[in-house]
Amino acid sequence: WLYRADVFEELGLEIPTNKDEFYNVLVKLKEAYPNSYPLAFRSFAGTMNQMNMLAPVWGTSFMDTEDNRFFGYDYDSGEWSFGPTSPEFKEMLEFYNKLYKEGLLLPNFLTIDTKGWQDVIANGDSFITLDYLSRIDFFNNSMRPSDPDFTMAYMAPAAFGSEGQAMFPNSAKAMMGFVVSSQTKKLDD
């Protein structure tokens, strides 16, 4: 999770540690900035990859992106489960639906492209997001010349739901990469 530390400091907000605190922080942000949507995600090229990052902290699963299975493995019971039919998944959807209905979640979070999402964060229209940690430097480096107080920072995950735990699941992973051979004749190019 990433958050605007400068805005939290300005409003005297603490990092939330559970679902209720998370909700209350969003409400306080909305009260202070009525035209904002305090929580924003980006669509990850039209996928629902946010669910892969969100579901495990609720004690459920969404989709294995490596082979497109909607199953999760429960290490405690030793059984596979179909995440989207679990009570925890329903609880998660109900929570985000509540945020959506109350204007606490960016309305186009499932379709907004990366540029639009960047603009929402940079313009101060949203203050909490879920993305790669490298985005901290991306936002701080690009925003501080015009707003020296702008501070995007890491926010430890809150425990969500009755079965949730404070964790960041291994869902944001690269499945490919680029390499340059040390034997190339154009190594210095």
Model-predicted segments: where are they?
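Extracytoplasmic/secretory soluble proteins
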Residues: W1-D189
